[in-house]
A protein has these predicted regions:
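Short acidic, gly/pro-rich beta-turn/loop elements at beta-sheet edges
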Residues: 17-19, 30, 60-62, 72, ...
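Hydrophobic ligand-binding cavity/cleft-lining segments
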Residues: 1-44
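Glycine-rich portal/gate segments that line the openings of hydrophobic small-molecule binding cavities
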Residues: 29-30, 39-80, 136
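Beta-strand secondary-structure signal
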Residues: 6-8, 49-51, 61, 73-75, ...
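Soluble, non-transmembrane catalytic domains of enzymes that act on hydrophobic metabolites at membranes
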Residues: 2, 6-8, 69, 80-86
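A short, structured loop/turn motif at beta-sheet edges
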Residues: 12-15, 65-68, 88-98
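Beta-strand/loop substructures that line and gate deep hydrophobic ligand-binding cavities in soluble
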Residues: 77-128, 132
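Short, highly charged C-terminal tails/helix-capping segments
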Residues: 35-36, 40, 128-137
Length: 137
């Protein structure tokens, strides 16, 4: 398995507020206008999943499989390999919360060198979207 980590982002909101927003994926609908247009094709969300298109991969489905005290785990479905994203959420102060996204993917060796940098960039892009969206609440 290969690990790809986003940069750690800081949200200027209390932990409870941030956790409440990211643990229910229906809340992504509020941020839809802040999500780059290329990721809103086939966009659907519900409490436990979000689906969207990523070129050239196709439709992806992220499904929450665990809600922990400071972590939310999501399976990445509709890929030709097993992958999971952990959203690590930390209380920094009464008004600040840190989030880091970690992708754990079972990428075939011959593909890893081709897509590795793109996956890392994708994790950072997701973190940037979260920062903009959550800070604007």
């Amino acid at each position: 398995m290969a690990l790809y980590q986003s940069k750690t982002i800081t949200v200027n909101k209390p932990f409870e507020e941030v956790y409440g927003k990211v643990s229910d994926l229906r809340n992504l609908e509020q941020f839809r206008d802040r999500i780059p247009k290329e990721y809103t094709v086939n966009f659907k969300c519900d409490t436990d999943y979000v689906q969207f298109r990523v070129a050239p991969v196709g439709d992806l489905l992220l499904r929450i499989v665990e809600r922990g005290a400071d972590k939310i785990r999501l399976n990445v479905e509709k890929l030709p390999f097993k992958a999971e994203i952990s959203m690590n959420i930390g209380n920094v102060s009464p008004s600040e919360t840190n989030i880091q996204l970690v992708l754990d993917a079972d990428i075939p060796f011959f593909v890893k060198h081709i897509v590795g940098n793109k996956l890392e960039e994708g994790m950072d892009k997701m973190a940037d979207i979260l920062t903009l969206s959550l800070n604007s609440l």
